[in-house]
Amino acid sequence: MSNPTPTGVVTRFAPSPTGFLHIGGARTALFNWLYARHTGGKFLIRVEDTDRERSTEAAVAAIFEGLDWLGLKSDDEVIFQHTRAPRHVEVVHELLAKGRAYRCWMSIEELEVAREKARAEGRAIRSPWRDAPEGDLSAPHVIRFKGPLDGETLVNDLVKGPVTFKNIELDDLVLLRADGAPTYNLAVVVDDHDMGVTHVIRGDDHLNNAARQTLIYQAMDWAVPAFAHIPLIHGPDGAKLSKRHGAQAVGEFADLGYIPEGMRNYLARLGWGHGDDEVFTDEQAISWFDVADVVKAPARLDWAKLNHINAQHLRKADDARLTALALAAAETRGEPLPADAAERIARTVPEVKEGAKTILELVDHCAFALKTRPLALEEKTQKQLTEETVERLKRLRDQLAAAPDFDAATLETVLKSFAESEGVGFGKFGPALRGVLTGGAQAPDLNKTMAALSRDEAIGRLDDALAPRA
């Protein structure tokens, strides 16, 4: 199913399509992707949709939308697990032929009694059909794995270290249900083997499954992949991540204005790091990442750190791309925008992106440029427009109109020269000028504000405010 890679390393991300792509799942996908890239291997995606009742097309779409946004794409055809049911059944029959599986006709009532007895004796459940002659094949029954009754199963986990499980405590898990449907632990082993997966990197809530899956590998005489069980992500308070901690789905982080490269950087830092390096590129992460360096303790979601990291990547991002993202975000707010909103944002982004942590903040910083004339002036600004200040701003208006260029550097020179020629400090006209140009909205330094507005818009706003009032 999977072509050999130069190093032979194959990782996979195997989500269940029962909901959105959780931030924890996204980090698991990223770690698999990083390790595959680091080793020159392959990163594969398999949708574990054997639970047909809970799996939905909407969830599949949401998962891939999140992965696409993060830039994590499979290096091969995406596998949908339910389509491989015949292969899963084939392996179960091989296990039956090897004497490593058996048919079980236990009723629900018998199963409950057996559970209570096993619990009292401190062992896993064992079916009376384990070594009994087969019953009526036409009667409903399941097929169970026939695990060893003594000894231990060792899982050499790349993150947790060696973990041993007493076989007496591992139950004879069901491989095929009474309706013929394969179970999770069986399907995972068969698919990972057939896909050539060499490294199973997943959340540590799957650690107990590793022992059961190891026994199935061994029963089939298949090579056991390397396991790496990474810690879960907790909220800032150390509790399990939940809705009360804010966003959980990757799509929610996108809606909040985070950008993919910032999110990848932050997710990589959740449980892994490279010295004191906090902000880094994908290329650096690929070069440095090793799953063996992932820490054992749960990682905590830190909004301040996420904002800091995202801000660094936002500043380095292409202005045209940021303009498109900011315009799209502004349009979703439902507020009327000027016809030339794209051009206004394009002029403003270079002047304000240094102070923004997210795309939503970038839109806020562009708000002054998106106002339409005439601007409604704040009461504070109206009071600042004394007769003396109005006359001074009229003189400044003429100098601005005559400026050879209307870029931030030129405008800084014009403002300084004007203050000197007037013999006053900037405070004598700057606050009123800012109010006239922005309508009280947040804005950068005045030279940058005017450059973002353009000569025509800045002069027009000045003319509106300085015109004689009725």
Curated annotation (Swiss-Prot):
A Pfam family per the record: tRNA-synt_1c
Placement of sequence motif 'KMSKS' region: 240-244
This protein's GO CC annotations: cytosol
Reaction equation(s) it catalyzes: tRNA(Glu) + L-glutamate + ATP = L-glutamyl-tRNA(Glu) + AMP + diphosphate
Motif 'HIGH' region per UniProt: ranges: 15-25
Record-listed E.C. numbers: 6.1.1.17
GO molecular function: ATP binding; glutamate-tRNA ligase activity; tRNA binding; zinc ion binding
Record keywords: Aminoacyl-tRNA synthetase, ATP-binding, Cytoplasm, Ligase, Nucleotide-binding, Protein biosynthesis
InterPro entries recorded: aa-tRNA-synth_I_cd-bd (IPR045462), aa-tRNA-synth_I_codon-bd_sub2 (IPR020751), aa-tRNA-synth_I_CS (IPR001412), aa_tRNA-synth_I_cd-bd_sf (IPR008925), Glu-tRNA-ligase_bac/mito (IPR004527), Glu/Gln-tRNA-synth (IPR000924), Glu/Gln-tRNA-synth_Ib_cat-dom (IPR020058), GluQ/Sye (IPR049940)
Record localization: Cytoplasm
Stated role: Catalyzes the attachment of glutamate to tRNA(Glu) in a two-step reaction: glutamate is first activated by ATP to form Glu-AMP and then transferred to the acceptor end of tRNA(Glu).
Binding partners and assembly: Monomer.
Name this polypeptide is given: Glutamate--tRNA ligase
Organism this protein belongs to: Caulobacter vibrioides (strain ATCC 19089 / CIP 103742 / CB 15)
Name of the gene: gltX
